[in-house]
Amino acid sequence: MTHLNLRLKDVDPEIFEAMEKELSRQREKIELIASENFVSRAVMEAMGSHLTNKYAEGLPGKRYYGGCEYVDVVENLARERAKKLFGAEHVNVQPHSGAQANMAAYMAFLEPGDTVLGMNLAHGGHLTHGSPVNFSGKLYNFVSYGVEPDTEKINYEKVFELAYKHKPKMIVAGASAYPRVIDFKHLKEIADEVGAYLMVDMAHIAGLVAAGLHPSPIPYADVVTTTTHKTLRGPRGGVIFCKAEHAAKIDKTVFPGVQGGPLMHVIAAKAVAFKEALSPEFREYQQQVVNNAKALAEELKKQGLRLVSGGTDNHLMLVDVRPVGLTGKRAEQLLDEIGVTVNKNAIPYDPESPNVTSGIRIGTPAVTTRGMKEGEMAEIAEIIALVLKNPENEDKHREAARKVRDLLNRFPLYDKLPYND
């Protein structure tokens, strides 16, 4: 029994060492990946708790296992907080990920082979919105809509034309790399016109929606999915919201349809994150995320870099690196070497392969969590431009790396974490 009380560093020093190095990486690099954030210690404590021991198939009050009275409290708190946060009629907090939330939503409303309209991955959509390499593109007949070549924004009239032509059973909205506001009301009107369900995947913008800084899809969509990390700043996981009339089929599709037992430690962490998101401080944080994104976009443009669609309305932006003679892959590598983490990303009408790309995606949630504001965005833009415009100049790279260290020293990340107290 003594093994129950041993510390991680004593039981598995190899894993402990890898975790220590990852903590150092997070502390010592400027995190600009739009889908990443830094959760609170409270969220980590819930996620790394003894709740991982408990099986709880089913829903609160209707479990297939005994001893669930306390995890029922946990899940009910998560559900009630999520409904309050987003003003939803019904929520299921059990999906293990955003992809599984999307799978459950599809399976609740569609049959294999049904036609679905979704945003093209290459134009900012997501793998689960119909990519042929994903289950969504294999099980359903997806027709893609995208952005215009000149504006690099969604043309809703063209979405309507596609919907009118193909008569989809469902229209999917939401994106993983679209820097502009999505008009859910307009998409609902299109869906109603052709008799389609409207599903919204708000994984990237959920935090902004919760804070009232992006129009909410909840009043318009039949079903809404999200992750709980990214801008929502919770643990990695998924959630599904829907109208009350669809509650039973959504719940049944999550379990036993696509999942077994829920991860109660993760649901506890979701509940903690939802409580944090209900605070006035969270809205202030989200406002700063948006302010920082706009500031960073403007500063990058001042540095001579081209932004897809000319800027951003949310937490992220896409930089076209072709004008500086780079690929997205090379730009990502160069920035990583001096301490700035981004991801290569396809841009609309990209001539490069998905493994190379012509762009990089940049987001502000994580740096905002560290406490950075508009002034620091100007510094970051200068660092990025210094490297991308001088890809072979090692002196410039050393200068950029020094600037990164100086900036991060002013914004320390995490004192102690639960695993290494």
UniProtKB/Swiss-Prot annotation:
Its cofactor is pyridoxal 5'-phosphate. It is found in: Cytoplasm. Keywords: Amino-acid biosynthesis, Cytoplasm, One-carbon metabolism, Pyridoxal phosphate, Transferase. GO terms for cellular component: cytosol. Its EC number is 2.1.2.1. It comes from the Bacteria. (6S)-5,6,7,8-tetrahydrofolate binds at L121, G125, H126, L127. It catalyses: (6R)-5,10-methylene-5,6,7,8-tetrahydrofolate + glycine + H2O = (6S)-5,6,7,8-tetrahydrofolate + L-serine. Signal peptide: none annotated. The modification N6-(pyridoxal phosphate)lysine is found at K230. Pathway: One-carbon metabolism; tetrahydrofolate interconversion; Amino-acid biosynthesis; glycine biosynthesis; glycine from L-serine: step 1/1. GO terms for molecular function: glycine hydroxymethyltransferase activity; pyridoxal phosphate binding. CDD domains: SHMT. Pfam families: SHMT (PF00464). Homodimer. Catalyzes the reversible interconversion of serine and glycine with tetrahydrofolate (THF) serving as the one-carbon carrier. This reaction serves as the major source of one-carbon groups required for the biosynthesis of purines, thymidylate, methionine, and other important biomolecules. Also exhibits THF-independent aldolase activity toward beta-hydroxyamino acids, producing glycine and aldehydes, via a retro-aldol mechanism. Belongs to the SHMT family. This is Serine hydroxymethyltransferase. It comes from Carboxydothermus hydrogenoformans (strain ATCC BAA-161 / DSM 6008 / Z-2901). The gene is glyA.
